Each structure stands twice: as C-alpha cells, then as structure tokens.
Amino acid sequence: RRCHETADYLDHLLDERPDLHGAALPYANHDELAELVMTRLWNRTRATDLQALADISSHEECDFWIALAILLRVFPDPQSDPALIALATHLVDRINAGTWRMRYSETPIVSPRGVELYSKLSEGRPELSLSEETMSRALAHAAWLARGQKTATRFAMFNGAPIWAANNLEID
C-alpha cells in the first residue's frame, strides 16, 4: 500500500502496526488529524481504533470540529460496547466544558448542518447531548465560517468561473 500523505501513513500504521501509531501521532498537524478522522473507515468495535480516536482527541491540535467529527463517527447505540459509550461521553463532557477551541477546520461538518445533525442524533440521550451554550456557540461559529468561505477569494467568481481557476489558466 502506498502512503502519499501523513493521514495515509497514520491510517496504514493503525492497520498494520498499531504499536507505532501512538508514536507517530504527535507529529501530525491539525489538517492531517482532520483528514484521518474524516477518511478512515473506523471500526467501532476494534480496541485499537477506539484508542486511536481517544489519542486524537487528546492531541494538542484537536479542536471542537475534530472532536465533533469523532463523535459523529462513533455515536453509540444504547446497547453499544461500554468502551465506545465511555469514549463518546468523555468527548461530550470535554466539549461541554469548553476544552477545545473553535477554529477553522478541514472537517466537512463545519457547518450549521453538521451541528444540527449531531443535535438530532443525540435527542433523548442527555449523556451525549451538547449543552445549549455549546450548541449556540457552534452554530454561530459555523455560520461565521460559512459566510467567510463564500466571500473568500477561492470561492469568488469571475465570468462564471472561480477566480482560482482563472488564475491557474495557462496563458500563451
């Protein structure tokens, strides 16, 4: 298997050498953690995957959006393995305590829709629900980021084409 990026390498280590994954993880940056969380097919019953997600949530580059992405990946049924429920509850407690800052993140759930999706999933599960304060802050932050993305240069249009595409055209 060919590893082109750090997230690929971490994914490979998790499958082939889980003993080395913990040693390599501290060298990953925020974007690489986000990519790993979003692209890996996580196994909710595999102890090494649960430990890796716990390690990612303890990483200094982890933020609110990566933690929310982890929660969406591992959201437990009431009959789930106690280790899975413990991980999810721990993440919710840390999110509600304001442990992780809200900043720009590569995770696609950085949107009001992603926050609302988690809110719907956690209905009737108070131990897994985000506090009202956290929800309102997350919705406001996601809306602010969405507004910024619409006006960012990379999303601006000129003659029906994105400006970044026009800037990359080769002109003779």
Question: What is each residue range found by the language model?
Answer:
Residues R1-D172:
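Alpha-helical scaffold segments
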